[in-house]
Amino acid sequence: MLTPPVGRGDHAFGPPDARVTLVEYGDFECPFCGRAYPELKRVLKELGPKVRFVFRHFPLVEEHPHAQHAAEVAEAAAAQGKFWEMHDLLYQRQQALEDDDLLKYAGELGLDVRRVQRELTAHTHAARVERDVLSGAQSGVSGTPRFFINGRSHKEPGDARTLAAALKRSL
């Protein structure tokens, strides 16, 4: 089960009263998350307002040295109202996640780059990322991507067809 349940502090896309809530624990540097990303976008587009999508950070820092800073820069973007734009950009450019790349992306999105740089250097958003990691650990997450549908772990393969079928069964 998902612990804690989806709340106001989560990054959510879609109507709050959707019949289905899909939560992903993801890592911006994880190749499996990168492969799942376009499929997930396709499924969410297909199902439209029937599904609310929530993203929670789960950077696998032992395996992915840039994942923590990527998560923190996504939070810095969120602080300027551009979480989802940064989320998408990080997955689209997953092979380039050095700090200089992250700051370049912030500029491309029209963010205050100096502010992002200060926040990244000071780890201003590290506690927010850690909160997601702890909730993932409490929910039994050990790898990424990991999905939960209406609070229940989705353990089937994460390909678009399987995920879409599971979401449709939950409608």
Regions found by a protein language model. Name each.
Residues M1-P4, R169:
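N-terminal targeting signals for export/organelle localization
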Residues T3-V20:
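A short beta-strand-turn-helix
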Residues P15, E46, G140-V141:
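Extracellular/periplasmic catalytic domains that process cell-envelope and extracellular macromolecules
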Residues P15, E62-H66, Q95, R118, ...:
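Alpha-helix initiation/capping motif
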Residues D17-R19, A70, G143-T144:
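A structure-centric signal for secondary-structure junctions around beta-strands
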Residues V23-E24, F28-E108, D112, K168-L171:
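Structural alpha/beta surface segment adjacent to cysteine/selenocysteine redox centers
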Residues E24-G26, F32-R42, L103-L171:
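C-terminal cap of thioredoxin/glutaredoxin-like
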